[in-house]
Curated annotation (Swiss-Prot):
One of its GO terms (molecular function) is protein folding chaperone. Belongs to the complex I LYR family. MZM1 subfamily. This is Mitochondrial zinc maintenance protein 1, mitochondrial. Residues 1-24 form a transit peptide. The keyword RNA-binding does not apply. Interacts with RIP1. One of its GO terms (cellular component) is mitochondrion. Keywords: Chaperone, Mitochondrion, Transit peptide.
Length: 123
């Protein structure tokens, strides 16, 4: 595969990742895409090889898809503490503190998986 094709594929993956991560936030979505476009036209670290720059863009796309979750404050909450709606999607990594500390642990990506609670702590 040519370098041009790899770069275009990485750019498309980045655009898809921004669409997923910033789904309901047009201002941030446009800013992220503008930053990605400017990074493609004028790379921030020209010392890196083209292959390394493409790999960096792929890594950023994976990070956006798996690790970035936006929250939006919910109005009209009956409690004193504010409530937030989180944009958790099918690609969001769900884990607990033990899996974060252990790099070999498998991370749950299924939203049907029950999240870890403090009361679930093994005794």
């Amino acid at each position: 595969m040519s370098t041009r094709t790899k770069a275009l594929n990485a750019y498309r993956h980045g655009l898809r990742a921004t669409r997923i991560a910033f789904r309901n936030d047009a201002e941030v979505l446009l800013a992220a895409r503008a930053k990605m476009r400017s990074g493609m036209l004028c790379p921030p670290d020209p010392k890196l090889t083209t292959e390394d720059q493409i790999q960096h863009l792929e890594d950023v796309a994976v990070f956006l898809r798996r690790n970035l979750v936006q929250g939006k404050k919910v109005d009209g909450s009956s409690t004193k503490e504010p409530r937030y709606h989180l944009n958790i999607h099918k690609d969001t990594e769900l884990g607990d503190n033990e899996t974060i500390a252990d790099p070999t642990a498998r991370v749950k990506t299924n939203l049907k998986a029950r999240p870890f609670k403090c009361s679930d702590k093994k005794q």
